[in-house]
Amino acid sequence: MPKYRSATTTHGRNMAGARALWRATGMTDSDFGKPIIAVVNSFTQFVPGHVHLRDLGKLVAEQIEASGGVAKEFNTIAVDDGIAMGHGGMLYSLPSRELIADSVEYMVNAHCADAMVCISNCDKITPGMLMASLRLNIPVIFVSGGPMEAGKTKLSDKIIKLDLVDAMIQGADPKVSDDQSNQVERSACPTCGSCSGMFTANSMNCLTEALGLSQPGNGSLLATHADRKQLFLNAGKRIVELTKRYYEQNDESALPRNIASKAAFENAMTLDIAMGGSTNTVLHLLAAAQEAEIDFTMSDIDKLSRKVPQLCKVAPSTQKYHMEDVHRAGGVLGILGELDRAGLLNRNVKNVLGLTLPQTLEQYDITVTQDEAVKKMFRAGPAGIRTTQAFSQDCRWDSLDDDRAAGCIRSLEYAYSKDGGLAVLYGNFAENGCIVKTAGVDDSILKFTGPAKVYESQDEAVEAILGGKVVEGDVVVIRYEGPKGGPGMQEMLYPTSFLKSMGLGKACALITDGRFSGGTSGLSIGHVSPEAASGGTIALIEDGDTIAIDIPNRSIQLQLSEAEIAARREAQEARGDKAWTPKNRQRQVSFALRAYASLATSADKGAVRDKSKLGG
């Protein structure tokens, strides 16, 4: 029978000092012996996805204590990728994932907490907490802050839906008036919550449902809606049950590594492909799998991407649907229900509610459930009122979107495409693979060949795009922006958005060893591995080289002979200490970022730290 971890600090005469300090936090004699549960919050006023989380930790804590546990709350950092985008701040985004994971480990292990409730929401916070949860392997439940309502405004006498990406594109489009750009900017992000499309934050919060670590509705129920409060209340109650099951009944099925199994990871990736999630999710699932000691690699993702269709299409791949529409169509369980009927899921998995996948679908799939409360929950909709307050409205759609032929979520028969929303490409300068969000690629450019325009930084590429130096048919290559080379693997949302601003969204390709925002669409290929700074062939591409992209056949090729590539590699090595570094880039890199770069692996490994360098 496992012993409560917290007993290390609460039992025995020699722990009198620790108990004295616990008493100073408000604990009493009756609390010693109860499970101590960490409420891992991430409130900050810097991030709209987290600005409303201040009081939500207290909600969870109250339920923990009412259910027989002791709750102790702390916060992690949280970086807003959108605000950090397009300048040196983006160097810090991906490294913050590792800091978040480590900080959770530090706090939980230093204080011997028995379990956790993770209150996350945005891009690196959910992955960081997920990595920590699987590393620590103590009972955990995730409950996120929820999606933002979609922006809405009237342009040319037509009401349109908006999000952050629209503001970025119109702000750089010389054909758009100042008044219209200002109108879009003011309308794009109307409420608290994670950005309203299927960007990285919402993708990851959906995937925690598929992994079994969060409750139904977690990925799609709006941050502003009153119904979301119940997820927090339930999490506080349920975590005490899970904790007691493990420590008092020796039930290891309550542990995250047994819930988020290899089968669950495959289901999560299947969901990701079917819903056209952010390419960043690939990076984060690979990293989380390593923490769980699960053999889940790019090869597994490649195999899944070849058989899973696209059943859901959401912004940025279309402006017709946002997360509020996904929720109305049944949310994550709506998509999983269609995948299950298509025979594409592993059914022998459970979630934090203790339900198997078939049991969960029977209760929460809107096309089969008889539970009116569930149907009511999925009718939770937007209010269209600017606010930073959680649970501030109770608006509902008049009806559910259960049209699987022409609605937001489709059945296999009516899939948006037989190929899924993400694909892994391989070739002679992406030997270990690269990722493209096919959901956002126009059919006309699924095969694309063109001359390379090579840039050693995102900044240089942006200047060239806005300066008219990139023209129709070009393949923009941005290198030395990988985990090590950046360092930090910057997102390339500005270059892709500015290509659209210049009318080149369907006329050019962009390839990088960096990564893309979940808000990116177009022929944008990232995560090229090995990266340039690790000796990747992407470092050998020169202006004018022909690059051939063939998404249907999962191929990407630099059209040079092996002899020419070998000669260029020899010339690169001859640079000595300067080999595999950018030639003319001026960039200030802090000690903290240099420390990150010294251990960073390429994207095909999840950009995690290279344990072999630490002897581990």
From Swiss-Prot:
Modified residues (N6-carboxylysine): K124
InterPro entries in UniProt: Dihydro-acid_dehy_C (IPR042096), DihydroxyA_deHydtase (IPR004404), DiOHA_6PGluconate_deHydtase_CS (IPR020558), ILV_EDD_C (IPR056740), ILV_EDD_N (IPR000581), IlvD/EDD_N (IPR037237)
Any one Gene Ontology BP term: isoleucine biosynthetic process
Pfam families found in the cross-reference section: ILV_EDD_C (PF24877), ILVD_EDD_N (PF00920)
GO (cellular component) term, any one: cytosol
E.C. code: 4.2.1.9
Catalytically driven reaction(s): (2R)-2,3-dihydroxy-3-methylbutanoate = 3-methyl-2-oxobutanoate + H2O; (2R,3R)-2,3-dihydroxy-3-methylpentanoate = (S)-3-methyl-2-oxopentanoate + H2O
Required cofactor(s): [2Fe-2S] cluster; Mg(2+)
GO molecular function, a single term: magnesium ion binding
Pathway listed: Amino-acid biosynthesis; L-isoleucine biosynthesis; L-isoleucine from 2-oxobutanoate: step 3/4; Amino-acid biosynthesis; L-valine biosynthesis; L-valine from pyruvate: step 3/4
Annotated positions binding Mg(2+): D81, D123, K124, E491
Lineage top rank: taxon: Bacteria
Cofactor stoichiometry and binding remark: Binds 1 [2Fe-2S] cluster per subunit. This cluster acts as a Lewis acid cofactor.
Top class in the EC scheme: lyase
Record: active site: S517
Keywords for the protein's UniProt record, in alphabetical order: 2Fe-2S, Amino-acid biosynthesis, Branched-chain amino acid biosynthesis, Iron, Iron-sulfur, Lyase, Magnesium, Metal-binding
Binding site for [2Fe-2S] cluster: C122, C195
Functional description taken from the UniProt entry: Functions in the biosynthesis of branched-chain amino acids. Catalyzes the dehydration of (2R,3R)-2,3-dihydroxy-3-methylpentanoate (2,3-dihydroxy-3-methylvalerate) into 2-oxo-3-methylpentanoate (2-oxo-3-methylvalerate) and of (2R)-2,3-dihydroxy-3-methylbutanoate (2,3-dihydroxyisovalerate) into 2-oxo-3-methylbutanoate (2-oxoisovalerate), the penultimate precursor to L-isoleucine and L-valine, respectively.
Subunit-level organization: Homodimer.
NCBIfam families reported in the protein's UniProt record: ilvD (TIGR00110), PRK12448.1 (NF009103)
Family that this chain belongs to: Belongs to the IlvD/Edd family.
UniProt protein name: Dihydroxy-acid dehydratase
Organism encoding this protein: Salmonella newport (strain SL254)
The gene coding this protein: ilvD
